[in-house]
Curated annotation (Swiss-Prot):
It is found in: Mitochondrion inner membrane. Component of the ubiquinol-cytochrome c reductase complex (complex III or cytochrome b-c1 complex) that is part of the mitochondrial respiratory chain. The b-c1 complex mediates electron transfer from ubiquinol to cytochrome c. Contributes to the generation of a proton gradient across the mitochondrial membrane that is then used for ATP synthesis. Heme b b566 binds at residue 97. Heme b b562 binds at residue 83. Pfam families: Cytochrome_B. This is Cytochrome b. Belongs to the cytochrome b family. It comes from Microtus subterraneus. The cytochrome bc1 complex contains 11 subunits: 3 respiratory subunits (MT-CYB, CYC1 and UQCRFS1), 2 core proteins (UQCRC1 and UQCRC2) and 6 low-molecular weight proteins (UQCRH/QCR6, UQCRB/QCR7, UQCRQ/QCR8, UQCR10/QCR9, UQCR11/QCR10 and a cleavage product of UQCRFS1). This cytochrome bc1 complex then forms a dimer. GO terms for molecular function: metal ion binding; ubiquinol-cytochrome-c reductase activity. Gene3D superfamilies: Cytochrome Bc1 Complex, Chain C (1.20.810.10). GO terms for biological process: mitochondrial electron transport, ubiquinol to cytochrome c. Keywords: Electron transport, Heme, Iron, Membrane, Metal-binding, Mitochondrion, Mitochondrion inner membrane, Respiratory chain, Transmembrane, Transmembrane helix, Transport, Ubiquinone. GO terms for cellular component: mitochondrial inner membrane.
Length: 134
């Protein structure tokens, strides 16, 4: 089985990504926040798409479309609250992820750190635009 795992081109990709993945010796629960960020982002995108199917951005009907989502759409209230609370959870995980990077000295890898800071500012700008939308 290990020969197929090491030699087959498609299985080799999965092997290097999941099975023989090098992990640091000091791995702990702090290393979960990157995966939780991906999960939170997927939930935000999914619930955002579902909410966008029923939301009307016209100033005259925006409030009534939100009321329609909460009252008339099946589990619309749940989707709306998952989207709202998911944004807060996303930022909690994001700041804990950055804090873990600072604690473990990840800023020494300059290119990776700079890319993370650019992504942090892009996420914060996107969230600001989401809160400011009429």
């Amino acid at each position: 089985m290990t020969i197929i795992r090491k030699k087959h081109p498609l299985i080799k990709i999965i092997n290097h990504s999941f099975i023989d993945l090098p992990t640091p010796s000091n791995i702990s629960s702090w290393w979960n926040f990157g995966s939780l960020l991906g999960l939170c982002l997927a939930v935000q995108i999914l619930t955002g798409l579902f909410l966008a199917m029923h939301y009307t951005s016209d100033t005259a009907t925006a409030f009534s479309s939100v009321a329609h989502i909460c009252r008339d759409v099946n589990y619309g209230w749940l989707i709306r609250y998952m989207h709202a609370n998911g944004a807060s959870m996303f930022f909690i995980c994001l700041f804990l992820h950055v804090g873990r990077g600072v604690y473990y000295g990840s800023y020494n890898m300059i290119e990776t750190w700079n890319m993370g800071i650019i992504l942090l500012f892009a996420v914060m700008a996107t969230a600001f635009m989401g809160y400011v939308l009429p």
